[in-house]
Amino acid sequence: MKAIITGGAGFIGSNLVDKLVKEGHEVLVLDNLSTGQLKNLDHSKNKIKFINIDLSKKTSELKEIFKKSDWVFHLAGLADIVPSIIEPKKYFNSNVLGTINVLEAARENNIKSFIYAASASCYGIPKKYPTPEDSQIDTQYPYALTKNIGESLVMHYAKVYKMPNTSLRFFNVYGPRSRTTGAYGAVFGVFLAQKISNMPLTIVGDGNQTRDFIHVYDLVEAIFKVAKKNPEKKIYNLGSGIEVTVNRIAELIGGEKIYIPKRPGEPDRSCADISKIKKDIIWEPTIDIENGVKTLLDKIDNWKEAPVWTPEKIQIATQEWFKLLDKKDDK
């Protein structure tokens, strides 16, 4: 198959590139390198094609690029809460306009399978755990909103234009090449950079909050199986189905800990109900958190150039978050 991976120079995208190349598929990566890095593709550069392109602008080029392609994996987009609060239009351009441009190019070229990387942030603060796909959508900030609008577009195109579209709601993904920037979301990148610098691990809140961490190798295996199975017009959660506390992650990484105030709008728990994808795709996550963290520690030097977030830097970076999302004054 000829596969197009948007955002293929990023953390998840580059790991998906590895999987598809290993399986013998032809791969074309589209990325504007705003957050992705070419070094993530260095080991595959002679086996793939790469185009530096802004998906929110080059609409006519996209239609030509997508010709004779079979699979599209739309992973490109902007993440992070705080920047989305400060620059919502930038996020709409990337996550909404970019998505509709990719959909149009795919529609005009009769793609055989279209897979969208959605976000579990669409659930906001869920009322049910594990959280199933039919849970209430309650986006808390522009990043979550734009990713969910993108998903709505993907499902709408499947309905109206009979496109073979599937949306996967990613929970907390970690593993090789995980991003190192941003004071939110990249907990492993923050912790590992702090450990290298012999600094305390900065924990937001009391550390008892749970997250559903899925290793990127398990994630790309699921994505690949979805592409082969092609379950059209379906939405799936993609996580491990297991809750792990942030304190447990800090314990596995090792070192002193320091605690800073909890941020508003963040759930105390996160856990994916993955029964639907397990049944439909015949997939199971295989890497537990203990072994997953061990593999990261074995290659901790990969994070030696990562920016080191001190508690003070994190609090400064998230000032706007507290200002806009703290609802104490609304009571």
Question: Language-model features: where?
Answer:
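Residue-level signal for the nucleotide or nucleotide-sugar donor/cofactor binding architecture
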Residues: G36, K57, I86, S94-L97, ...
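Conserved C-terminal active-site "lid" loop/helix of NAD(P)H-dependent oxidoreductases
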Residues: V216, R248, R263-T295, W303-W309
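Glycine/proline-rich active-site loop of Rossmann-fold NAD(P)-dependent oxidoreductases
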Residues: N148, V173-G189, S197-N208, V216-Y217, ...
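Hydrophobic "lid"/C-terminal helical patch
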Residues: L16, I223-A227, A250-I253, I274, ...
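Glycine-rich Rossmann NAD(P)(H)-binding loop
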Residues: T6, V173-R177, I203-F213, Y236-V244, ...
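A short C-terminal helix-loop "cap" of Rossmann-like NAD(P)-dependent dehydrogenase/epimerase domains
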Residues: D134, G189-I203, K229, G255-P261, ...
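Mid/C-terminal beta-alpha module of Rossmann-like enzyme folds, strongest
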Residues: K229-P264, D273-I274
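N-terminal Rossmann-like NAD(P)+-binding domain of SDR-like oxidoreductases, especially those catalyzing
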Residues: M1-V173, Y217, K299, W303, ...
